[in-house]
Regions:
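Bacterial N-terminal signal peptides that target proteins for export
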Residues: 1-7
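Sec-dependent N-terminal signal peptides
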Residues: 7-13
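Alpha-helix boundary/capping residues
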Residues: 11, 40, 73, 95-98
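Bacterial signal peptide processing site
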Residues: 20-22
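C-terminal capping alpha-helices of c-type cytochrome domains
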Residues: 81-102
């Protein structure tokens, strides 16, 4: 029983350590939405095909929702608070233009 508790404790700690509160990534002023996505997002959001970057829900299929998610992150997604202004707009436009809606 002690071994099970130890394994569970170590597993929980590993999961918590993996949860990052935010990234300090700041895109170049002239970075395209695709470049920002490739650098900041594609490590977790692998493109599904040549023309589909990811699948998003209908509730996320708008620019404001995407930008809010990028800034705040979630339990499973790192926040990117330094993707601001025009760069955030370009990223959101890229995601919308290259995603399928579920």
């Amino acid at each position: 029983m002690k071994k099970v508790n130890l394994v569970l404790g170590v597993s929980a700690l590993a999961i918590l350590v993996g949860c990052d509160s935010g990234s300090d990534y700041t895109p170049a002023a002239d970075a395209s939405g695709e470049q920002i996505f490739s650098t900041a997002c594609s490590e977790c959001h692998k493109p599904l095909s040549a023309d589909v970057a990811m699948i998003i829900s209908e509730g996320m299929a708008n620019k404001d929702a995407i930008i809010n998610k990028v800034h705040s992150g979630s339990m499973r997604m790192t926040a990117f608070p330094n993707i601001q202004g025009d760069a955030a707009d370009r990223l959101a436009e890229y995601v919308l233009a290259n995603s399928a809606t579920q």
